Amino acid sequence: MASLLLLVLAAAVTAQLNIVPSTHPEVCVLYADDHQADANKFNGNFTQIFHSYNSITLSFMSYSSSSYDVIDIISKYDLSSCNILAIDVFNASMDFNVFLQSTNNCSKYNANKVHHVKLPRGEEWFSYSKNLKFCPLSDSLIGMYCDTQLSDTYFEISTGGTYEVTDIPEFTQMGYTFHSSEEFYLCHRISSEAWLNYHLFYRDYDVSGVISKQVNWGNVWSGFKTFAQVLYKILDLFFNSKRNVEPRA
């Protein structure tokens, strides 16, 4: 009888060790650090309201307002856990949409060096760079109307002080040499499907030019100048989406 009681107790203890993964939804806000003081005001009692009442986690993540390198910004965080993500876009030239509306493999290259890269035909490649030049190579590895040893003879891909996204035509078998005075990225577009439920909140936004053609207007908002505006709007979008899919009682 004693041994039977011991087995029952052991079974009860074992049952308590079962680990059930958390299914609490997570609402994320990625913001420029000039909003840090405002974000701190909400990171406390306000976040606890939603955690205790709705079992929702509010996660605040910041990036430097002096950095326009979107790849570096989004690679610092695991955004895959976000059920919905709000991004405070500090400057309209920042191409968050390019890297969130599609899946890309990007490689980073050092500045002030010549890089020889082959870009296979039939694939989509683009550069994310500033002050980048390239020289296409012939089948005999000779620069076509450019000298691979002299970067001043290269053809310009991007100019200016902010990062630009530029599609690269894949027309040579032997590839290209690239040179830039700044670090740059070459990216292979794997798919054109968004991998995250995200919304872009522009502080100021001019609906013109190349950027306007790249944006999915269903998730773009303009004139959101404060952290509070972004936070309340993303919460409103989150709860509205839940009401749209959940049956009424």
From Swiss-Prot:
Signal peptide positions (record): 1-15
Pfam families, alphabetized: Rotavirus_VP7
Keywords for this protein: Calcium, Capsid protein, Disulfide bond, Glycoprotein, Host endoplasmic reticulum, Host-virus interaction, Metal-binding, Outer capsid protein, Signal, T=13 icosahedral capsid protein, Virion
Disulfide pairings: none
Compartmental location: Virion; Host endoplasmic reticulum lumen
A Gene Ontology molecular function term of the record: metal ion binding
GO cellular component: host cell endoplasmic reticulum lumen; membrane; T=13 icosahedral viral capsid; viral outer capsid
Sequence similarity: Belongs to the rotavirus VP7 family.
SUBUNIT field: Homotrimer; disulfide-linked. 2 Ca(2+) ions bound at each subunit interface in the trimer hold the trimer together. Interacts with the intermediate capsid protein VP6. Interacts with the outer capsid protein VP5*.
Its job: Calcium-binding protein that interacts with rotavirus cell receptors once the initial attachment by VP4 has been achieved. Rotavirus attachment and entry into the host cell probably involves multiple sequential contacts between the outer capsid proteins VP4 and VP7, and the cell receptors. Following entry into the host cell, low intracellular or intravesicular Ca(2+) concentration probably causes the calcium-stabilized VP7 trimers to dissociate from the virion. This step is probably necessary for the membrane-disrupting entry step and the release of VP4, which is locked onto the virion by VP7.
HAMAP family: Rota_VP7
Protein name listed in UniProt: Outer capsid glycoprotein VP7
Organism: Rotavirus B (isolate RVB/Human/China/ADRV/1982)
